[in-house]
């Protein structure tokens, strides 16, 4: 018996390692497909409501247009915000040159020659490599968008078909489990996006208010950037903290003010992103804050930025599936924020 248990655990570990390796190396396909499934779950209520009043294909077109419009608005806001910042930087290059001269002089006085470091680090091969890296990432982004869009369209078209196929299964328990599990996953995905959007709006408003009070120029742009980037856990808030900090350094020329702004922005991001949001999301989704953070880090490791965004929805789906079966119900209970109702 003991030997059988060891073999069973060993096989489970081997299967887990193989699965994780497969997910890692299939990122180019699995990440956009997973994102598409998540988007279908979010957009389906609109599609379902529309196709009760208009033809299915027309409802699909409207749903796709609305989904793309939301994504386009978010992208536009980021481009608009950083565009204002970039224009401000161009108009204030003299300040940047002055800061660079001061920093170089200070480093030289402490025995660090920044000029020699830059000269030694310069390598045309590095520039070529950087250009190739940018090109590769751009190709990856385009590929991600194309694959995700294709599966979003197909997914929205086949939701009703998939439901009818499940309803024709002979096993009543399996049929009930699949339908109820899918409904719960979709419902939790929608709750997650409500929480995410609420926290992003709160972050944007607080950052905007802080920038106004602190006298930071382009306060609206920084608030908008913080709002949009907050949809990408940890990576987005990091960017929304570092860029305003460097901007303040150029604006004021004071390292003390720069440090103070950096500390304040980190406090804002920590309180909202690491304290309020995990607890609110955990309460809404019956997940512990620890699991919320672990999901983001784990899937970021596997799939990068895409994993950071969809890591928590994946964990939501896994735990919801575990709820539906007696053999795995204990896993969902152990990782929950509190007491769960029996499925």
Question: How should each PLM-predicted stretch be described?
Answer:
Residues 30, 34, 50, 205, ...:
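Transmembrane helix boundary and interhelical junction motifs in multipass membrane proteins
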Residues 46-54, 61-62, 74-148, 159-169:
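Juxtamembrane membrane-interface segments in integral membrane proteins
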């Amino acid at each position: 018996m003991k030997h059988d248990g060891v073999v069973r655990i060993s096989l489970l570990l081997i299967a887990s390692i193989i699965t994780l390796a497969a997910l890692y190396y299939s990122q180019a396909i699995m990440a956009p497909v997973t994102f598409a499934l998540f988007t279908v779950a979010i957009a389906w209520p609109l599609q379902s409501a529309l196709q009760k009043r208009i033809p299915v294909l027309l409802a699909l077109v409207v749903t796709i247009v609305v989904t793309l419009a939301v994504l386009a608005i978010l992208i536009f806001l980021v481009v608009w915000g950083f565009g204002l910042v970039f224009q401000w930087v161009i108009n204030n290059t003299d300040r940047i040159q002055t800061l660079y001269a001061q920093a170089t002089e200070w480093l030289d006085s402490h025995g660090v020659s920044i000029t020699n470091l830059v000269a030694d680090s310069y390598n045309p091969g590095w520039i070529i490599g950087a250009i190739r890296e940018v090109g590769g990432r751009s190709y990856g982004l385009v590929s991600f968008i194309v694959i995700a869009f294709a599966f979003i369209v197909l997914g929205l078209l086949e939701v009703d078909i998939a439901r009818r196929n499940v309803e024709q299964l002979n096993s009543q328990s399996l049929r009930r489990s699949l339908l109820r599990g899918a409904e719960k996953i979709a419902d939790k995905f929608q709750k997650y996006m409500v929480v995410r959007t609420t926290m992003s709006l709160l972050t944007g408003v607080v950052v905007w208010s802080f920038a106004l009070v602190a006298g930071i120029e382009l306060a609206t742009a920084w608030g908008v950037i913080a709002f949009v980037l907050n949809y990408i856990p940890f990576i987005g808030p990091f960017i929304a903290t570092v860029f305003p900090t460097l901007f303040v350094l150029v604006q004021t020329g004071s390292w003390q003010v720069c440090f103070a702004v950096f500390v304040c922005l980190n406090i804002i991001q920590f309180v909202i992103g690491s304290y309020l949001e995990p607890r609110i999301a955990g309460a809404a989704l019956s997940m512990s804050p620890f699991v919320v953070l672990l999901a983001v880090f784990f899937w970021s490791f596997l799939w990068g930025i895409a994993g950071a965004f969809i890591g928590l929805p994946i964990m939501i789906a896994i735990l919801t599936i575990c709820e539906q079966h007696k053999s795995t119900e204990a896993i969902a209970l152990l990782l929950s924020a509190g007491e769960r109702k029996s499925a």
